[in-house]
Amino acid sequence: MECKRARAYSSSANLGSGFDILSIAHTAFFDTVEICVENKNLNNIIVESNSKIPLEPNKNSATYPIVKIMEEIGIKASLKVRVIKGIPEGLGLGSSGASAAAAVMAFNNLFNLNLSKEDLVRYAMYGEIASSGSPHPDNVAASVFGGVVSVVSVSPVKVVEIPINYSFDILLFTPLNVHIEEKTKKAREMVPKTVTLSDYINNSRYISSLLLGFIKGERELIRLGLNDKIVEKARLPLFPYYPKIKEVAIKYDAIGACVSGAGPSILVLTDKMTDENKIVEEGTKTCNEFNVECKVIKAKIAGGVGIEGRD
C-alpha cells in the first residue's frame, strides 16, 4: 500500500487591513495528512483522525479538495486519509486551511500530478468551503507557499510571495476557553458590505505601508500597516480584549499587533527592541480581566507545505 504524508503550518490571515488578501505562515502549530492508496479499482475515501472532525469526505476540509481533484482530473482510487490535527480549531490560526494544504500536497505527490503551487491553493480552497461555506484563499495560500503572501487574484488564483527584509518573531495570544459555534461563518457575516470612503482610504494606506515595510525592512512602516479601520472594528464583540492587548504590545515596543484571521487569537510581532516578557505578563493579565484564559505561543515565520520523510 503506497502512502504519502505532508505537513502544513498554521497561519494568521488579514494582518490588519488585508482581509482575504494577506496571510503569514508560522511555526506555532502544524497539521499532518497521510494518504494511502488501498485499491485503484474502487472509488471511495475513508477518513480517520485524532480529532472530532467530519468523516464524510465532502464535509471534511482535508478530503473535499481531494474529491474535487479526482473529479476534475478523472482519478479513480480507494483512499485512506488520516488527518492528524495539531492546530487548534476555531482560534483563527488557519486550521482548516492547513489540513487542506497538507492533503492536496500529499495527493499531488502520491499521484505524481505536478500541480503548481497556485493549483494547490485553488484546490485547497475547497477545504474552506467544507469548513465554513466560503472559499477564502488567504490561509491556504500561506500554508502552501509559506512566509507572507498576498492573494492578488482568485479567478484565476494568483499568489505573490512578499519578500521579508526585517527580522521579527511572533507571539500568539490563544484563548483556551473561548468557543464560538461556526465562528468563521459568523465572523464573515459581521464584515460590513459597504464602507465609508475615509475608512477605505485609511485601509489602503495601511496595507501599502505594511507591504512596503516588509519589502524595505522598515519597522515603522510595518507598525503602521498592522492596523485596520473596517473588519477588526466590526468583529470586536468576538474579542473585546484585543484593543487592550494591542495597547500593551505597543507600550512595550512590539512592532505591532493585530487579530489573527477571524480571531479570537491575537498576533503580536516582536523584535530585539521588544520587552516580550512584559507583553506576555500584562497581556495574560488583560485576558484574565475578560475571563479569558490565554496561552501565549512564541513562533517564527514558517515555510510552505512539504512531504514528510523526504531527504
From Swiss-Prot:
Catalytic activity: L-homoserine + ATP = O-phospho-L-homoserine + ADP + H(+)
Superkingdom per UniProt: Archaea
GO biological process, alphabetically ordered: threonine biosynthetic process
Subcellular location(s) per record: Cytoplasm
Main location: cytoplasm
A GO CC term attached to the entry: cytoplasm
HAMAP family, sorted: Homoser_kinase
Protein's name according to its UniProt entry: Homoserine kinase
Gene for this chain: thrB
